[in-house]
């Protein structure tokens, strides 16, 4: 996946120049990478956003720490039958992922756009249709399996699509008319808390924060949501701090 490619194509060469041996291990689930990290089978993992890590380590009593952000394929609003945000019309149809966490992200995005208005006290992680206070454009939100969103674009006016499914279906992230502006769900690299201040860990963090990696990532992963400290706005985004909710694009972890 993309996080594995970042290691192979940029991070590994940077660290090897400093004398490290880097071994990449790829996982196909969201549980093993944190357990392997906690147990010492790997030294770093890169696959998850902070809310997922926070809940996982609390549930499993693991002493892990998020150490650096990585470019992440974001949730985006893509054209369907209509090609621009200005073309939105009364009764427009918008498809969105049907799982609760990603549906909440979609609602937050539509709220950001001003197409709907959510209740003032809504928890953005848990927003549902019941939290829509106003719908001045009579937007019809069509819920469907996240994996089916890309190919159903021709059936709706706009589609809210997860970055990983957009990429796997051949869509370009740069086609998005709007990306969620929140940095709450950019993915992080995680370390064992006891290791964070060690020389090797600081060198790994330094590699991900280096100008060399930034230059590579901006060229190789166009349209991604980049680390907040890079200060690069998302497509059509205003940089809101409203939270959104989980999607992990792919799994990869690097060990020294």
Regions found by a protein language model. Give the residues of each.
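Alpha-to-beta junction loops
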Residues: 38-48, 92, 115, 137-140, ...
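Short, polar/charged alpha-helical segment
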Residues: 1-23
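A bilobed periplasmic-binding-protein/Venus flytrap-type ligand-binding module shared by bacterial periplasmic
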Residues: 74-85, 185-200
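A conserved helix-loop-strand patch within extracytoplasmic ligand-binding domains
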Residues: 67-117, 214
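Ligand-binding "clamshell"
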Residues: 55-67, 82, 155, 160, ...
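Periplasmic-binding protein-like
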Residues: 104-111, 208-229
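Short helix-initiation/N-cap motifs at beta->coil->alpha
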Residues: 24-35, 122-151
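Pocket-flanking alpha-helical
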Residues: 30-61, 77, 83, 168-170
């Amino acid at each position: 996946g993309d996080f594995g490619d970042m290691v192979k194509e940029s991070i590994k060469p940077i660290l090897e120049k400093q004398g490290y041996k880097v071994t990449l291990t790829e996982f196909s689930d969201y549980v093993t990478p944190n357990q392997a990290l906690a147990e010492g089978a790997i030294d770093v993992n890169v696959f998850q956003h902070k809310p997922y890590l926070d809940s996982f380590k609390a549930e499993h009593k693991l002493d892990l720490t998020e150490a650096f952000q990585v470019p992440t394929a974001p949730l985006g609003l893509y054209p369907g039958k209509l090609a621009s945000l200005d073309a939105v019309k009364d009764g427009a149809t918008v498809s969105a992922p049907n799982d609760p966490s990603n549906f909440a992200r979609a609602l937050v995005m539509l709220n950001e756009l001003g197409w709907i208005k959510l209740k003032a006290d809504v928890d953005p992680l848990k927003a549902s249709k019941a939290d829509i206070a106003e719908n001045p454009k009579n937007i019809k939100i069509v819920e469907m399996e996240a994996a089916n969103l890309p190919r159903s674009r021709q059936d709706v006016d706009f589609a809210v699509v997860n970055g990983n499914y957009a990429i796997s279906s051949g869509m370009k992230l740069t086609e998005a008319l709007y990306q969620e502006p929140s940095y709450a769900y950019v993915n992080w690299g995680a370390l064992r808390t006891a290791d964070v201040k060690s020389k090797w860990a600081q060198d790994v963090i330094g590699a991900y924060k280096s100008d060399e990696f930034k230059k590579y990532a901006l060229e190789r992963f166009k349209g991604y949501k980049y680390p907040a400290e890079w200060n690069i706005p998302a497509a059509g985004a205003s940089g809101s701090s409203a939270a959104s909710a989980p999607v992990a694009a792919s799994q990869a972890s690097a060990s020294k």
